[in-house]
From Swiss-Prot:
It comes from Helicobacter pylori (strain J99 / ATCC 700824). The gene is hcpA. Slowly hydrolyzes 6-aminopenicillinic acid and 7-aminocephalosporanic acid (ACA) derivatives. May be involved in the synthesis of the cell wall peptidoglycan. InterPro entries: HcpB-like (IPR040239), Sel1-like (IPR006597), TPR-like_helical_dom_sf (IPR011990), TPR_rpt (IPR019734). This is Beta-lactamase HcpA. Belongs to the hcp beta-lactamase family.
C-alpha cells in the first residue's frame, strides 16, 4: 500500500515539474544577449552564437553586433568580413551605437569594403548621436584633422567634450589637449583630471605635467609626482621617464 502511495506522489511531482516547465517563458531578446555573454565567458562560442542569432532575429541590435564581432574575429565561426558588415549594419539600423562605430571602423580601414572615410564618418556620427562615447571621440578626431569631413576644430572639441561627459577617457584627453593648445590651462586640467579619475594613465601624466609646471594651477610637485606614479603604473613611458628624471622610485 505504501509503495503505491510513493509511486502516486512521484507521479504527481513529475507532472508538476512538467507543468512548471511548460509555464516558463522563453528568454526575451535582452536575456538571450546575457546568455550569449555568459557562454562567451565559458568559451562556448557555438552556444553563444545560437543565443546571439536568436536575439538578432528578435531585433536586439546588440545581439547582431556580437554576431558581427564573431565573424570579424573568427570566433566560433570562419572569419567572414562580409557577414560581419551585414550584422554590424543590422545592429546599427536597430540603433545600437556600438554597431555603428564598428561598421565605421571597417569603412575607415577598408576591411571587407572599399576604404571610404566619408561613409565611416557618417556611421561614427550616428554612433555618437546614439550616445556611444567612442563614436564621438573618433568622429571628433575626423573633424580635428579634416578626414572624411571638413576640418572643424570647434566641432571636434564639442565632440570630445560629449565623449568625455560619457566617460570616454580619450575624449577627455583630446579635449584637454585642445584647451592646452589654446592656453586655457584651467579647462585642460579639468579634462585631464577626469581622464585620470577614469584610470587613464595618460590623463594622470598630463595632469602631473601641468601641476609640476604650474600651468593653470599653483605648482605642486608632490601631487605631480603622485600622478606620474599613476601614469607609470599604467605603462605610460613618459610618466616613468619623469620619475627617473626626478630620481624617484615607483
Amino acid at each position: 500500500m505504501l509503495g503505491s502511495v510513493k509511486k502516486t506522489l512521484f507521479g504527481v511531482l513529475c507532472l508538476g515539474a512538467l507543468c512548471l516547465r511548460g509555464l516558463m517563458a522563453e528568454p526575451d531578446a535582452k536575456e538571450l544577449v546575457s546568455l550569449g555573454i555568459e557562454s562567451v565567458k565559458k568559451q562556448d562560442f557555438a552556444q553563444a552564437k545560437a543565443h546571439f542569432e536568436k536575439a538578432c532575429e528578435l531585433k536586439e541590435g546588440f545581439g547582431c553586433v556580437f554576431l558581427g564581432a564573431f565573424y570579424e574575429e573568427g570566433k566560433g565561426v570562419g572569419k567572414d568580413l562580409k557577414k560581419a558588415i551585414q550584422f554590424y549594419t543590422k545592429g546599427c539600423e536597430l540603433n545600437d551605437g556600438y554597431g555603428c562605430r564598428l561598421l565605421g571602423n571597417l569603412y575607415y580601414n577598408g576591411q571587407g569594403v572599399s576604404k571610404d572615410a566619408k561613409k565611416a564618418s557618417q556611421y561614427y556620427s550616428k554612433s555618437c548621436e546614439l550616445n556611444h562615447a567612442e563614436g564621438c571621440t573618433v568622429l571628433g578626431s575626423l573633424h580635428h584633422y579634416g578626414v572624411g569631413t571638413p576640418k572643424d576644430l570647434r566641432k571636434a572639441l564639442d565632440l570630445y567634450e560629449k565623449a568625455c561627459d560619457l566617460k570616454d577617457s580619450p575624449g577627455c584627453i583630446n579635449a584637454g589637449y585642445m584647451y592646452g593648445v589654446a592656453k586655457n590651462f584651467k579647462e585642460a586640467i579639468v579634462r585631464y583630471s577626469k581622464a585620470c579619475e577614469l584610470k587613464d594613465g595618460r590623463g594622470c601624466y598630463n595632469l602631473g605635467v601641468m601641476q609640476y609646471n604650474a600651468q593653470g594651477t599653483a605648482k605642486d610637485e608632490k601631487q605631480a609626482v603622485e600622478n606620474f606614479k599613476k601614469g607609470c603604473k599604467s605603462s605610460v613611458k613618459e610618466a616613468c621617464d619623469a620619475l627617473k628624471e626626478l630620481k624617484i622610485e615607483l
